[in-house]
């Protein structure tokens, strides 16, 4: 199964790329994690945020391969503990489809992305910086994968 993380924002600090890549490379051949970056719209003093969100949403949806399961990361989504995420990942694999995880920009995801979502996942009630979310999600996915594959990474 391939999991695509489709995230609004480019030009992340080196520590973000290093952290994401560290977990990305750990997956075995049966599970791959790919990052697709969507350029964020320019946000200035008088920016039309609704329009920017719409454009980001169109670009995000265009990056999703046909047939992929769409999972959005949202504050209002369902919080998952490690075991619940692992069970979800197991279901995703049995479903036979690849997964696109959508991460919005500073104002979140466009309404059209949320509408296309099959599952909404909340990482936390905290507001997290978007660069850090990439690493947290990559690590969480790796931890879930390790649980499903009896890999010693996760310890109770």
UniProtKB/Swiss-Prot annotation:
<dbReference type="GO" id="GO:0070038">
    <property type="term" value="F:rRNA (pseudouridine-N3-)-methyltransferase activity"/>
</dbReference>
<keyword id="KW-0963">Cytoplasm</keyword>
<feature type="binding site">
    <location>
        <position position="104"/>
    </location>
    <ligand>
        <name>S-adenosyl-L-methionine</name>
    </ligand>
</feature>
<feature type="binding site">
    <location>
        <begin position="123"/>
        <end position="128"/>
    </location>
    <ligand>
        <name>S-adenosyl-L-methionine</name>
    </ligand>
</feature>
<feature type="binding site">
    <location>
        <position position="73"/>
    </location>
    <ligand>
        <name>S-adenosyl-L-methionine</name>
    </ligand>
</feature>
<comment type="function">
    <text>Specifically methylates the pseudouridine at position 1915 (m3Psi1915) in 23S rRNA.</text>
</comment>
<dbReference type="InterPro" id="IPR029028">
    <property type="entry name" value="Alpha/beta_knot_MTases"/>
</dbReference>
<keyword id="KW-0698">rRNA processing</keyword>
<keyword id="KW-0949">S-adenosyl-L-methionine</keyword>
<protein>
    <recommendedName>
        <fullName>Ribosomal RNA large subunit methyltransferase H</fullName>
        <ecNumber>2.1.1.177</ecNumber>
    </recommendedName>
</protein>
<comment type="subunit">
    <text>Homodimer.</text>
</comment>
<dbReference type="Pfam" id="PF02590">
    <property type="entry name" value="SPOUT_MTase"/>
</dbReference>
<keyword id="KW-0489">Methyltransferase</keyword>
<comment type="similarity">
    <text>Belongs to the RNA methyltransferase RlmH family.</text>
</comment>
<dbReference type="InterPro" id="IPR003742">
    <property type="entry name" value="RlmH-like"/>
</dbReference>
<dbReference type="GO" id="GO:0005737">
    <property type="term" value="C:cytoplasm"/>
</dbReference>
<keyword id="KW-0808">Transferase</keyword>
<dbReference type="InterPro" id="IPR029026">
    <property type="entry name" value="tRNA_m1G_MTases_N"/>
</dbReference>
């Amino acid at each position: 199964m391939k999991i695509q993380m489709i995230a609004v924002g480019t030009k992340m600090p080196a520590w973000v790329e290093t952290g994401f890549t560290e977990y990305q490379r750990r997956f075995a051949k049966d599970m791959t994690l790919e990052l697709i970056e969507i350029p964020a719209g320019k946000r200035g003093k008088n920016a039309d945020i609704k329009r920017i969100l719409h454009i980001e949403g169109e670009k995000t949806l265009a990056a999703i391969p046909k047939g992929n399961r769409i999972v959005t990361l949202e504050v209002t989504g369902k919080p998952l503990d490690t075991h619940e995420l692992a069970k979800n990942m197991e279901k995703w694999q049995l479903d036979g489809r690849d997964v696109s995880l959508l991460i919005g920009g500073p104002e979140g995801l466009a309404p059209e992305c949320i509408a296309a979502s099959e599952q909404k996942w909340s990482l936390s009630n905290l507001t997290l910086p978007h660069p850090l979310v990439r690493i947290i999600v990559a690590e969480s996915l790796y931890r879930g994968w390790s649980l499903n594959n009896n890999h010693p990474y996760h310890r109770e």
